[in-house]
């Protein structure tokens, strides 16, 4: 259980409270500048200037060293490609938990499963500098998953993803959501910033709706993704339709 109580970051994020349960997928939604990245950075433990309490199974986040943090959570921020050059498999090796409990056979099994799910098995010996934006993002995602994969790291509790689908095409995005579902099935809590509200409608167990640093509402996707509520926050027309018993949101 991850508990966030009265968390704030100056004027960028006003006090909010919520919980993240193991195996639960939480989407943070809202317009650009609403505080999504600020919230995720604070929860990751690397952000400065936050006030309030963030507890991982009762342990205060501020009391953890960076090494301990890396065992409990993985954080995929919005980031440019690194200046140094490595092959993909070397980069992924650096992503393994600092005190990996896995044997070589377990590491290889985890790498094989994650690489296949993200369709990067044929890229392990490529230079990271030669990858496209979508390929590089999938490699970064693989690294984050290796860091918190339960067979390699029994201390892992949380995966934090800041707009992970942004560089991905439609097919790659589908791979991403299957991977997130797999991570959640392993008992890891997942929290992610997301702009595709139809994906949120289908894949989120919990939704946090932010506007100008304020948590407007939270709850299930069905409770939060109400057209009237979304119109007020996003300042655009929203319509809900049903096709083959599946609900979709239309905008504009």
UniProtKB/Swiss-Prot annotation:
Domain of life: Bacteria
Topological category with respect to the lipid bilayer: Peripheral membrane protein
Assigned GO CC terms: plasma membrane
Residues involved in ATP binding: 30-37
Catalytic activity: an R-cob(III)alamin(out) + ATP + H2O = an R-cob(III)alamin(in) + ADP + phosphate + H(+)
Protein location: Cell inner membrane
Organism of this sequence: Vibrio atlanticus (strain LGP32) (Vibrio splendidus (strain Mel32))
UniProt xrefs under PROSITE patterns: ABC_TRANSPORTER_2
ATP-binding as UniProt keyword: yes
Quaternary organization: The complex is composed of two ATP-binding proteins (BtuD), two transmembrane proteins (BtuC) and a solute-binding protein (BtuF).
Similarity section: Belongs to the ABC transporter superfamily. Vitamin B12 importer (TC 3.A.1.13.1) family.
Function comment: Part of the ABC transporter complex BtuCDF involved in vitamin B12 import. Responsible for energy coupling to the transport system.
Short name of any one Pfam family annotated for the protein: ABC_tran
Keywords, alphabetical: ATP-binding, Cell inner membrane, Cell membrane, Membrane, Nucleotide-binding, Translocase, Transport
Annotated PANTHER family: METAL TRANSPORT SYSTEM ATP-BINDING PROTEIN TM_0124-RELATED, VITAMIN B12 IMPORT ATP-BINDING PROTEIN BTUD
Entry annotated with the keyword ATP-binding: yes
Listed InterPro entries: AAA+_ATPase, ABC_transporter-like_ATP-bd, ABC_transptr_BtuD, Metal_Ion_Import_ABC, P-loop_NTPase
Enzyme Commission number(s) from the entry: 7.6.2.8
Domain ABC transporter, first and last residues per copy: 2-237
Gene coding for it: btuD
Any one GO MF annotation of this record: ATP binding
Name of this protein: Vitamin B12 import ATP-binding protein BtuD
């Amino acid at each position: 259980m991850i508990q966030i109580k009265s968390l704030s970051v100056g004027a960028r994020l006003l006090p909010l409270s919520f919980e993240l349960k193991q195996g639960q997928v939480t989407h943070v939604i809202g317009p650009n500048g609403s505080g999504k990245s600020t919230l995720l950075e604070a929860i990751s433990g690397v952000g400065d200037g936050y006030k309030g309490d963030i507890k991982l199974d009762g342990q205060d986040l501020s009391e953890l060293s960076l090494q301990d943090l890396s065992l409990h959570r993985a954080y995929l921020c919005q980031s440019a490609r690194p200046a140094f050059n490595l092959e993909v498999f070397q980069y992924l090796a650096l992503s393994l938990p600092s005190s990996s409990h896995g044997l070589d056979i377990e590491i290889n099994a985890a790498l094989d499963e994650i690489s296949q799910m993200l369709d990067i098995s044929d890229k392990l010996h490529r230079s990271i500098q030669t990858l496209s934006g979508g390929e590089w993002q999938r490699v970064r995602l693989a690294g984050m998953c290796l860091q918190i994969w339960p067979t390699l790291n029994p201390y892992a509790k949380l995966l934090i993803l800041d707009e992970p689908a942004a560089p991905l095409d439609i097919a790659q995005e589908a791979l991403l959501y299957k991977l997130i579902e797999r991570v959640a099935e392993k008992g890891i809590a997942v929290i992610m910033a997301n702009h595709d509200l139809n994906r949120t409608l289908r894949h989120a167990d919990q939704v946090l709706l932010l506007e100008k640093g304020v948590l407007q509402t939270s709850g299930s996707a069905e409770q939060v993704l109400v057209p009237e509520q979304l119109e007020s926050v996003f300042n655009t027309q929203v319509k809900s339709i049903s096709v083959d018993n599946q609900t979709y949101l239309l905008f504009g």
